[in-house]
Amino acid sequence: VVRDKTNKIIGDRAFSNRVKIVSKLGDYCIKMYTKNRIGTVIKHIPGHGLAIYDSHFSTPAVNEKKKILNNIDFLAFKNKKSLFAMTAHIIYSQYDSNNTATHSKIIIDDIIRKKLKFRHLLISDDICMKALKYSLKENVIRSLKAGCNLILHCNGNINEMRIIANNVPKIDDFVIKKTSQ
């Protein structure tokens, strides 16, 4: 959901500044793409509209009240049928002031899985973005422990790929089932 202070990195990639429009357009896009056998990824869950900084370069922190987050930003993602969702590298301080959503078991379990009822594959955003403050290996481990099913790595650096490959488990039955649909 776009806001007045939404960082320009999201601006024109969001559907609207109204949660109902975002939600309905999201449902429609997921339905039509799926009907045509095209996979969808909803992002950046649980919401990126209140982030004023670009998570490619720094760690955004959202300090909004839970009621507003739940009724606007998070609500846009509720009950979505997409087979994939991508996490936000954003700290939501009202829920977990120490971790980005990607590294937060609280955000992933309580918000994304329970409140928003997302039951499919959760992908980290690019694991090399500057919003994540640990080493590559630690970012991978923290993302998986928090509840991400897959790790996204975008820069093509083979040495980084080896670090990631050496720190991720073999694909489990949940991932196999979801990617076979």
Kindly give the residue locations of the regions a language model identified.
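Short, conserved phosphate-binding/catalytic loop or strand-edge motifs used
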Residues: 2-9
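Second-shell loop/turn segments in exported
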Residues: 11-18
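A short, charged, Gly/Pro-tolerant segment at domain boundaries
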Residues: 177-181
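Second-shell residues forming the walls of enzyme active-site clefts
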Residues: 21-34, 39-174
